[in-house]
């Protein structure tokens, strides 16, 4: 029950509010300030018909018309608007005026209505001043302003492919507005078009001209022959008159003018002009303005409540917000009306207005040759021109070029081998060689040092190009020595502006007509200059120095790895040890057979086993010290096979390492991992601001590599190439043509990997240059005739040099001392080792000799001691003999002497003379034998003192024999034999 009460109360309140709103929505007064009764009548009829059009008028909504006549006096117009329109609470005003009365009266209506925020829709005012919303705050118009014709100019220039124009305009508001519109719109318009029109010259004049000759003389110096003119009808007559006198309305000149100039009474034949469709159809514009207003009010009613319009001009405090909102709704309208598609821009100016393209024929006849109209399918304006119906100046049917084609051109080039070689002229030189062309450098103040001569691939191309398409030229070098890149520069001290430097900057700023150089075609440059078809196709590649195999002192060890060498060394000694053990423990190796010959081979010792193992490995003859046992000899045969394989493998690999050709490159190309992940020991670079630099900046996948190489980039390619040769730079990334030339010239350089970033070299020209097509056609003919191939062979590939490089690569490397120095050093080490060992042996031997001497001294002392003992024994024996002798004298017969010696006490005597043997001879002989000896120095034989010695005593006796005689000075010895009795 409570819910039902709440629902009914809510429904009653909403219904009451809706009823009040409908009562308020019931009537809307539309004011009209019109020029004549026909317009007023048509205005009333249109509103009457509108009330029955349910598409635009909601139920219970009715429109009423309130009209006044436009007065030429703007003050009266203001009073009429206040007293006859605003007092009637008009929600909007439609205003028109006569073209001859000026725009003061419509401006008065706009000021007055705008003060109270009442929207005003103009149907005839086209002055640029009404676009200023600071003054005309609530003014819209169903006709476009005059300066919107600049949009149609751009479409026409694009259709005719004119790229350079001269703009002629008056210095009033509309004249400057059309220039600003052209310049502003062209910046965005040409983003979608290939051909960009540039303003070569702007000629501004004061209205109400009396003469235009001075301006025409100045215009003749320009290259463009396309004139876009905004002028009043009176000023246009003066301009056309003087242009005819200067022959500037003849063949080759193109005049495109606005509506006012088109109606001059002396408009030359061939002039193209614009005529707004429905420009004088007040009835059509009245209807469209009323329906636009009804459409806006309908949408506003559905969204919000419209407050009552102001009623009193005397109330200055009135602020009608609904009027401001209604003005915003009006600007968003887009309907199809009697005058075409009706829509507005932010300034309230009509867009999508249609124009007829008028061609002036003989006797001032106007002929429509095209239309600029709204395309419903594409929802935008579209230009259609029938070129075949146009009669151009000089009664020509063929479209003029639109520019004066100069036959003497200013050309620029840059030093880049082999395309352009630059040679400074000597002090005594006045002319270049026949194959050279003068190319001065104009950025130096030294007048004696700026004369150069240029030759090369591009110079030969230029000479042939000039002959083919018939032009003369002045050639100069790039002022800053750069191809050019797009950088930010501070021009005025407060603003930064991006502009081109180098050759591109000279061309963009029109300081040169053509660039003849190895200029890479890329999107950044093509946006600002024209390119011919490529005269040489190329790409980007990498230049590096060929990797040379380092010849160290151990180059002969390169065939085997260190591990293999160690294994071979270990194997030699392991095999030697096993051979020794096998031969030692074999029953046929350690012991000799019982019936064997005494000359049988000795068993293998460890030293001989090592000698055998090395001898087999080094293939030296082994004469002795071979294994004796069968098991050891089997191992020896296996070791010999191993040695044969090792030596053969070493020999083959040595030839591969030292004789065969070197590896080509270190890098595999741009995708080499060492480039993508640049290491500290691998440096790569290109030239700053070059096309290659731009390429790397464009490629996202190369961004990491570019950040690394950016700090290493060089100012010139020449400097970078020199650093590659010196080994300071490992990889230089540059145009393939230049790098292939460098590689063909120097056998130590090589290009790595495949080409990437393929493009071409083209001739650079200004945007819209008349020479572009001619140069392109000539280059295509050169390709077909083989002329470009001839230039390639002559300047880039250097066939004979490249052939020498190939011969050098295929020829085996000759081994030199550097390659095999290690072997000689090894021999030297062996010799030094042998000398060292012999020195060690000598030192060791001296040590042994000293030791032996000490042993000999000790042995001599021992022998001397033993000798002393023997002497004592001998003395005792002598005494015993003497006693026996004395006894014998007493017992034996005279004439005999007994010399018997005890065998046990005199073993030496017994060995020589036998036991119990008497000395033969008489007493005289005994006496001779008993003579004293003179003992000389050590090592000398003893001498007999006095008388001739016995034959036996004259000889040097061995030590053993000398000891047979008793010592002379033994105690108890006497030589006196006088007591003997014979």
Swiss-Prot record:
One of its GO terms (cellular component) is postsynaptic density. InterPro entries: ANF_lig-bd_rcpt (IPR001828), CaM-bd_C0_NMDA_rcpt_NR1 (IPR018882), Glu/Gly-bd (IPR019594), Iono_Glu_rcpt_met (IPR001508), Ionotropic_Glu_rcpt (IPR015683), Iontro_rcpt_C (IPR001320), NMDA1-like_ligand-bd (IPR049872), NMDA1-like_N (IPR049873). GO terms for biological process: calcium ion homeostasis; chemical synaptic transmission; ionotropic glutamate receptor signaling pathway; long-term memory; olfactory learning; regulation of membrane potential. Residues 972-982 have a biased composition (Polar residues). It is found in: Cell membrane; Postsynaptic cell membrane; Postsynaptic density. Residues 934-982 are annotated as: Disordered. Pfam families: ANF_receptor, CaM_bdg_C0, Lig_chan, Lig_chan-Glu_bd. One of its GO terms (molecular function) is glutamate-gated receptor activity. NMDA receptor subtype of glutamate-gated ion channels with high calcium permeability and voltage-dependent sensitivity to magnesium. Mediated by glycine. This protein plays a key role in synaptic plasticity, synaptogenesis, excitotoxicity, memory acquisition and learning. It mediates neuronal functions in glutamate neurotransmission. Is involved in the cell surface targeting of NMDA receptors. Plays a role in associative learning and in long-term memory consolidation. This is Glutamate [NMDA] receptor subunit 1. The gene is Nmdar1.
